[in-house]
Amino acid sequence: MSKKFVHTQEELEKLSLKELENLAASMREKIIQVVSKNGGHLSSNLGAVELSIAMHLVFDAKKDPFIFDVSHQSYTHKLLSGKEEIFDTLRQINGLSGYTKPSEGDYFVAGHSSTSISLAVGACKAIALKGEKRIPVALIGDGALSAGMAYEALNELGDSKFPCVILLNDNEMSISKPIGAISKYLSQAMATQFYQSFKKRIAKMLDILPDSATYMAKRFEESFKLITPGLLFEELGLEYIGPIDGHNLGEIISALKQAKAMQKPCVIHAQTIKGKGYVLAEGKHAKWHGVGAFDIDSGESVKKSDTKKSATEIFSKNLLDLASKYENIVGVTAAMPSGTGLDKLIEKYPNRFWDVAIAEQHAVTSMAAMAKEGFKPFIAIYSTFLQRAYDQVIHDCAIMNLNVVFAMDRAGIVGEDGETHQGVFDLSFLAPLPNFTLLAPRDEQMMQNIMEYAYLHQGPIAFRYPRGSFILDKEFNPCEIKLGKAQWLVKNSSEIAFLGYGQGVAKAWQVLRALQEMNNNANLIDLIFAKPLDEELLCELAKKSKIWFIFSENVKIGGIESLINNFLQKYDLHVKVVSFEYEDKFIEHGKTSEVEKNLEKDVNSLLTKVLKFYH
């Protein structure tokens, strides 16, 4: 095995500072090379190279829990953990994950943000109960500190006094810069033994000072908060080192060694540059955060241009049109303005549309209050991230029966981001909620109609749409959206019917066209609504058909199959139901087409299964 990147802690310790810097440069080159071919999270990984090397040098990755928040910035860690020979398979089907996974030797799975410090706290408790001497190390970006869970964990960690290191990667995504050289000097001074001892003595003196002197001392302490962010963490009971240069290996290693020696919870504040080492990406957060394949020299995408608009682009344009038409429309996204297309609305209507950072719970509840005040909120959110606000969806929207619209992007299989990001559960967790209405467009025109309907609808409503483009274009005429009404797209005398939902309609149509070429046929229904179902149409369909095939990009449990079976039981109807929804297991990463083929959900596999029912 090549030893270019794979180093044990002992081997790293033997390298000179210059050799470590050369290692960092080689790793950046490798990361750029692989991401340019496979796509991935580029800028965040380029900004965390030195931090990861220093972690592996000062701490023992085989013993100390290494916890990466979100873990999209863990590529260097992978290269240092024996993954060099398979690094070229990054994000590919059956290849290396773009996130941390225990099955690949990592401590914990990650993909959603702001979990690392809670994991570190739990690891600290377990280590203490076992009587062991390990130290958890959590690497978290400053953007992830915009989520409340991170502060909940910091609050307990500061009170616990467990040995733990929180490495804060500040790439200017949310934390403001400290002020000048004085701040840097004071922050670094805080880590010295003299400062720690001096601070404790001052605290004891304050206990015996008269009130007036104590008041002046407190005012003096408050003034320090204007100079450095360190006291925020200190007030939570955490030691603080920083800010340091997150690309200066000497500084990082020194800070980590100091933190390790403290044997207390400590935050190291490291300032980094996203995209470091690739000039085209440096400082350009949004464009180079997550990328597809690109040409290294020009930075241009090498993906063949798709003339079809993405579902996200269609959503964004439609919402712009609606917002210009209806002044009571407002909207929010949680740290995904460009990903959801809400950036265009934030730019045009800054007083009506907001990015609230990684704060899905707050996003939902704040919009619930706006709905209570007579506004019509559109919450633009990825299907997978709506899971993070489930209690708020129930407690603050459904129970109140408020007029809130949930626009769920990235529904279905999302491809290379894998199991933590697949949008295959939203139907299952929203369908049981009273007052909720659920629907999905099959194409661009139906998306427009559904969004207009969603604005007029009374009560909470959610519609889902895929990553990328709709498969269908103008194969079928659009229909007016009426509550709980489906559309019978292909009607004939066949005893077999295809029931499609959202992008599933396209799959059903592709299978049906292949059947028709074999002189077979089937009815095709676009359910449009998952809740409420079109019971009138389905009762009519049940009289003339014997087998219903379900095409929907959700898991089977709690999905369309479950809803259809409940309907059949309600009316004592006897129809065989065959669902092509996803099985009860998490879906791995890879190109969507390859993942579908692995799951036997591609058109050819579905056709083979359907043909078994034709005699």
UniProtKB/Swiss-Prot annotation:
Q: What is this protein called?
A: 1-deoxy-D-xylulose-5-phosphate synthase
Task: Show the InterPro entries listed in the entry.
Answer: Dxylulose-5-P_synthase (IPR005477), THDP-binding (IPR029061), Transketo_C/PFOR_II (IPR009014), Transketolase-like_Pyr-bd (IPR005475), Transketolase_BS (IPR020826), Transketolase_C (IPR033248), Transketolase_CS (IPR049557)
- Please give the coiled-coil regions recorded for this protein: none
Gene Ontology CC entries for this record: cytosol
Q: How does it assemble?
A: Homodimer.
Gene that encodes it: dxs
State the species of origin: Campylobacter jejuni (strain RM1221)
Which SUPFAM superfamilies does the protein's record reference? Answer: Thiamin diphosphate-binding fold (THDP-binding) (SSF52518), TK C-terminal domain-like (SSF52922)
PROSITE patterns per UniProt: TRANSKETOLASE_1, TRANSKETOLASE_2
Sorted UniProt keywords: Isoprene biosynthesis, Magnesium, Metal-binding, Thiamine biosynthesis, Thiamine pyrophosphate, Transferase
**Similarity-based family:** Belongs to the transketolase family. DXPS subfamily.
Entries under Gene3D superfamilies matching the protein = 3.40.50.920, 3.40.50.970
Listed binding positions for Mg(2+) are D142, N171
Q: What are this entry's molecular-function GO terms? A: 1-deoxy-D-xylulose-5-phosphate synthase activity; magnesium ion binding; thiamine pyrophosphate binding
SMART domains referenced in this protein's UniProt entry, alphabetically: Transket_pyr
